[in-house]
A protein has these predicted regions:
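Non-heme di-metal
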Residues: 1-177
Length: 177
């Protein structure tokens, strides 16, 4: 596996809060999902789709309230939320969560939406740093997943049709692709 120890070092209290929050969520995911990388990806993408939507909505409301242009941020943030949603739709096809797992995922998303919105309202810097640390954790998790696929500990499988269509992949692409 590649060296994944490089990450943004916390500079201040806001960064330390963001890193601690991210590490706590990673700890919870590790307890629940261990080596079930498909399920971990579903939760990761469920959570990853939230920040762009929340930030886009709050900037939209601020733009309306102040009657000022958003300088294109709403569109960028909502496009990011949509991209993360497509990752989620892909991994739902891979992991095939049970109804109970879906309920847990929806509950986690609901709680995270509220928590992230509160954090964003109090400190946009902390909220954006959380997203940065989430991306670091995503790289770590997906690198582990890819390592499991490449070593054969997890069987590779055909890429879901939704992924092939969304990312214009060749017809016979696999999960590794």
């Amino acid at each position: 596996m590649q060296n994944l120890n490089n990450h943004y070092k916390p500079d201040n209290m806001s960064d330390r809060i963001a890193l601690s929050f991210t590490k706590f969520l990673r700890f919870v995911a590790d307890i629940f999902f261990k080596k079930k990388y498909g399920h971990r990806a579903v939760v990761l993408e469920t959570i990853a789709a939230v920040p762009g939507m929340v930030a886009g909505m709050l900037i939209h409301l601020k733009s309306l309230r102040k009657m000022e242009d958003d300088k294109g941020w709403i569109k960028i943030l909502l496009e990011e939320a949509e991209n993360e949603r497509m990752h989620l739709m892909t991994f739902i096809q891979v992991a095939k969560p049970t109804p109970i797992e879906r309920f847990i995922i929806i509950s986690a998303q609901f709680i995270f939406i509220i928590m992230y919105a509160i954090i964003y309202l109090f400190s946009q810097r902390t909220a954006h740093r959380i997203v940065g640390y989430f991306e670091e954790e995503a790289v770590f998790s997906y690198t582990e997943y890819l390592d499991e696929l490449e070593t054969g500990r997890i069987k590779d499988q055909p890429a879901p049709k939704i992924a092939i269509d969304y990312w214009n992949l060749p017809l016979h692409s696999t999960l590794k692709d």
